[in-house]
Amino acid sequence: MDIQLKRGVLDVCVLKAIKNEDSYGYKIIKDVKPVLELSESTLYTILKRLEEANMLVVRVVIHEGRIRKYYHITENGLKRIEEFKSEWKELMDIYQFIVEE
């Protein structure tokens, strides 16, 4: 799979995982696991990239004596999900054309 396409898919999967409620790293990995194997290091790279792109913001909370970062989707992140859905539909139309006999 093309690296840019894969990166886009991973980014949107992470955004989707935090769309309805703020979440933290381990829970995000657990939430996307049914559709995607995601390592911790890959997730944190994605989260950093999304934060730099203003698609999410980070809130630090002390939980059971430990620091936990919660990630919250921004309007830019919500917009990216919608853009991706539109782009994916176009890709699916192209795919149908290619595999058609």
What are the functions of these language-model segments?
Residues 82-101:
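Amphipathic alpha-helical dimerization/coiled-coil segments
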Residues 42-45, 74:
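Ser/Thr-centric signal marking residues that sit
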Residues 47-49:
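Short, hydrophobic-biased segments on the C-terminal half of alpha helices
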Residues 2-42:
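N-terminal helix-turn-helix DNA-binding core of bacterial DNA-binding proteins
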